[in-house]
Amino acid sequence: MEKLLIVNADDFGLCKGQNYGIIDAFRNGVVSSTTAMMNSVDINHAAELSAQYPALPVGMHFVLTFGRPLTAMPSLTDANGELGKWLWQRAGAGTLDLNEIAQELECQFERFSAVFGRPPTHIDSHHHVHMLPQIYPLVAAFAREKSLPLRIDRHEVQQHGLTLDNPRSSEWFNAGFYGENLSEPSFLQLLEHADQQGVNSLEIMCHPAFIDQTLMTSGYCYPRLTELAILTSPTLKPAIAQRGYRLGSFLDC
């Protein structure tokens, strides 16, 4: 039986280098889906590229840890009005304002529809914040309300004891294509691991990009260029097919 592989490029809209890298990996490689950051400075540029390449499915990358929110979020922003990774400290302290988060989720969704002219194909999140135990029920309910698939990290489900209410998703998600020691064989090992688990639909996260001044300030910079080289390798797509996978998106879930 042919299996589904979703190669989803996160961070669409982060900057032009990221946007161009994702499009290149879609046109000339194995990226089959992407998710957009609606509070990022180059989101309109991403939407322009999306209009040029409408075959690329675009979902929403819900953001609570980067940039400025679209709504007032005094409980999660610093003195400069910026979001940050202190979200986990607030979560650990039990001080998350879920009403603020729900309003921001709705606003990012509405902006997606306005900017891209259509709803997202699915929802995931920056730094996987939607898998936090306090936030997951909120985002899962929102996805069900909008009839949208949702990225589900089964490791996080087990770790936090989350209850899955039959969400539309891939059977498995793997965040392992990330870091300093990436290669084509390491990408293919993720498929082999999924096979060992008997998985018929797999999502792999990636961040292919060309380096620009914005990415030079990121803690995850040059590996994005390595990802792009691997994902556009002429031997990768045939190797995926040889392992019984077809490339697709959350529209196939």
Swiss-Prot record:
Pfam families: YdjC (PF04794). The keyword Amino-acid biosynthesis does not apply. It is an enzyme of class 3 (hydrolase). Disulfide bonds: none annotated. It comes from the Bacteria. One of its GO terms (biological process) is diacetylchitobiose catabolic process. Keywords: Carbohydrate metabolism, Chitin degradation, Cytoplasm, Hydrolase, Magnesium, Metal-binding, Polysaccharide degradation. Mg(2+) binds at residues 61, 126. It is found in: Cytoplasm. Its EC number is 3.5.1.105. Signal peptide: none annotated. GO terms for cellular component: cytoplasm. Pathway: Glycan degradation; chitin degradation. GO terms for molecular function: chitin disaccharide deacetylase activity; deacetylase activity; metal ion binding. Belongs to the YdjC deacetylase family. ChbG subfamily. Homodimer. This is Chitooligosaccharide deacetylase. The lineage of its organism: Bacteria, Pseudomonadati, Pseudomonadota, Gammaproteobacteria, Enterobacterales. The gene is chbG.
